[in-house]
A protein has these predicted regions:
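Short, small/polar-rich motifs associated with maturation and membrane association
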Residues: 1-324, 336-337, 401
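Proline-centered flexible-loop/turn and helix-kink motifs
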Residues: 87, 92, 364-368, 412
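Outer-membrane beta-barrel and related beta-rich outer-membrane complex signature
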Residues: 195-202, 312-314, 338-365, 422-429
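Acidic/polar loop-and-plug regions of large Gram-negative outer-membrane beta-barrel proteins
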Residues: 239, 253-257, 261-267, 342-344, ...
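Outer-membrane beta-barrel transmembrane strands
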Residues: 277-296, 303, 386-429
Length: 429
């Protein structure tokens, strides 16, 4: 009823009743056969949950702005490359989109909170990202080192940061050492990547048939004559079985003595399958050590990520190394020192030929063109030789962050924070 009265029928004596209501703690009561008078307690734990806002923390019950939080359990359970990918779909109003770099292994996702609204060319709608209180790139942080992520969505929540927080704030707090026995934690995963939207490429017979029809309608001639069509049919049926014969490779020598690629070739190549790998393996390893006592706590963590790209030819790989150290020392009853050091290195290799024209040309290559010629060389006019032998672009990026903080408490609950930080970044190609 309206006063919380309820009646249950056919309940055996000695049964345990579970009573719950929104905003109250769940209670279990054993029924002895007599009427029960049950009083539920307020669920203060939900309201006491601490979220990071501005320069400090608040209980949820006191937060009036729009704030969302994700804890470490969510981030650690997702085998992804970086923090931005781990946050996808986890926070309402946090939108991710692919930028101009596309799906390159070192590319960053575009992030906006509750949509983007900008004024004038060159303006940006990106949120302010703070890692342990200082601005940084979230993709340089190992997701396993994160304790929680708070997203401040509205003006009331982010106003303390001023104009730079006009599009919201993302606050990332990394884990601290925990007093007690030394604990060693290791986690690793092996994952596989695949391209999920590869276009379907027509086979050589259908391609040659349609091409001849178009050529005949336009010019009254054909590109693939009857001999070519017969060779295509034989090749697709596996009729060429002698690797010492040029027909085995889907080509013959032309009148100029060169192996033919376009007109005159009769292989059956799916160029999307040729350039893109399937089920590419990647691996990640995380190791952390933490412990301490009432006076001092420490944490040391490291990680290694080896992410392979989807390109079959040439070097396409991304590697990230991270090292994070934290120590907290109680120098006196009224002063505590916190020191934090982070180091991240990213190495990325990709073929020099990786331009927009490369992806454009994959779809333009005829399926009749062979991958290799009868001499075992990569076929001319195809991108494979540029990918394999045209060199590679190598980049190395390093981030080093040092933070130190002194927390003074001259009287109970009056905290004075004195902080300093130094960030270093360098890259070479």
């Amino acid at each position: 009823g309206i006063d919380g009265d309820f009646t249950l029928n056919n309940v055996p004596k000695g049964s345990t009743l579970v009573i719950s209501f929104v905003g109250y703690e769940t209670m279990e009561v054993k029924w002895t056969g007599t009427p029960l008078n049950i009083i539920l307690k307020d669920d203060t734990q939900m309201l006491d949950e601490v979220v990071v806002v501005g320069y400090g923390t608040q209980k949820k019950v006191n937060v009036t702005g729009a704030v969302s939080m994700v804890d470490s359990k969510v981030l650690e359970s997702r085998p992804v490359q970086n923090v931005a990918q781990a946050l996808q779909g986890q926070i309402p109003g946090l939108n991710m989109s692919v930028g101009n770099s596309g799906g390159a292994l070192d590319a960053s996702l575009n992030i906006n909170i509750r949509g983007a609204g900008t004024i004038g060319d060159g303006s940006s709608g990106n949120p302010l990202i703070l890692i342990d209180g200082i601005e940084g790139d979230m993709n340089t942080v190992n997701p396993n080192d994160i304790a929680n992520v708070s997203v401040l969505k509205d003006a009331a929540s982010s106003s303390i940061y001023g104009a730079r927080a006009a599009f919201g704030v993302i606050l990332i707090t990394t884990k601290n050492g925990i007093s007690g026995k030394t604990r060693v934690n290791y986690s690793g995963n092996l994952r596989f990547s695949d391209a999920i939207q590869k276009p379907n490429m027509t086979n050589s017979w259908d391609f040659a048939t349609y091409f001849n029809e178009a050529q005949r309608n336009a010019y009254g001639t054909v590109i693939f004559d009857e001999d070519d069509m017969n060779r295509i049919k034989t090749y697709m049926s596996g009729g060429y079985t002698d690797p010492t014969k040029p027909e085995y490779y889907g080509t013959v020598a032309g009148s100029n003595g060169r192996w033919q690629n376009y007109g005159g070739a009769f292989a059956n190549t799916n160029w999307f399958d040729e350039f893109y790998e399937s089920w590419v393996p990647s691996q990640e390893h995380n190791l952390s050590i933490n412990g301490g006592n009432e006076k001092i706590t420490y944490l040391l963590s490291g990680s290694f990520l080896d992410q392979k790209g989807l390109l079959r030819h040439g070097s396409d790989k991304f590697q990230r190394y991270t090292l994070n150290g934290k120590i907290s020392v109680k120098l006196a009853d009224w002063v505590t020192m916190n020191y934090n050091n982070k180091w991240t290195r990213e190495n990325y290799d990709r073929p020099t030929y990786m331009t927009g024209l490369f992806f454009h040309n994959i779809a333009r290559r005829w399926p009749t063109c062979p991958v290799v010629d009868p001499n075992g060389h990569w076929s001319a006019d195809m991108e494979i030789i540029q990918m394999e032998e045209g060199g590679k672009q190598t980049s190395e990026k390093n981030w080093i962050t040092n933070q130190i903080q002194f927390v003074f408490e001259p009287i109970k609950d009056w905290h004075i924070n004195v902080e300093g930080s130094l960030r270093q970044y360098n890259e070479k190609y």
